[in-house]
Amino acid sequence: MSFSDQNLIWVDLEMTGLDPETHKIIEIASIVTDSELNILAEGPVLAVHQPEEELVKMDDWCTNTHTSSGLVERVRNSDVSEQDAVAQTIEFLEKWVPKGVSPICGNSIGQDRRFLYKHMPELEEYFHYRYLDVSTLKELTRRWKPEVLDGFSKQGTHLALDDIRESIAELKYYRETIFKI
C-alpha cells in the first residue's frame, strides 16, 4: 500500500439522467492510481438504491442502457444508500490519498462532480478543486490531430468501474501518442 499526496483519485458515477436537480446517482466506483497512472487499488463498486419513483424518471437511453447492463436490477436489490456509498468510498480513499490533494479524475468528470456536489457533498469535498478530465484531451485531439482518435476505442459499457478503467487507458494512450512521454 502506498499512501501519497501524489496519488490520483478516479471516480465515475452512473445516474438516472443528466440533471442533478432532478436525477439521482445509481452507481459509484473509484480507483486510485499513482502519478504514472498505475492502478494501486480499486474502491468499492456500489449500486446505490433509489426508489422506483426515481427510476421511472429515466429517459429511454438511460432505461435501455442501465437495464441491459444489469444496473437497474442491482439498484432495485441494493440496500446501499447515498450516505452509505459516501462513507464506504471515503473509507477507501483515506487509505491512499490525503483529503483535498487529488484532483477529481475521469472522463467528462465535471458532470460527475455536479452530482457529487448535489447528492454527496461530503465526498465532493474530499477532492482538490482541480479536475483531471480526459475528455479535454479528446476534444483538443479531435480538433488538432483527429487521426490520433482512430487508435483508441472504448467498450462503453456504462458501468462505473469499466468506465474508469477505460478513462485511465485513454489517458495513457494520449500520453504515449500526443505527449510522447
UniProtKB/Swiss-Prot annotation:
A GO cellular component entry from the record: cytoplasm
Residue ranges annotated for the Exonuclease domain, each copy included: 8-171
E.C. number: 3.1.15.-
Single GO biological process annotation from the record: DNA metabolic process
InterPro entries per record: Exonuclease_RNaseT/DNA_pol3, Oligoribonuclease, RNaseH-like_sf, RNaseH_sf
Active site: 129
Enzyme class: hydrolase
HAMAP family per record: Oligoribonuclease
NCBIfam families xref list: PRK05359.1
Similarity field: Belongs to the oligoribonuclease family.
Function: 3'-to-5' exoribonuclease specific for small oligoribonucleotides.
Name the record gives this protein: Oligoribonuclease
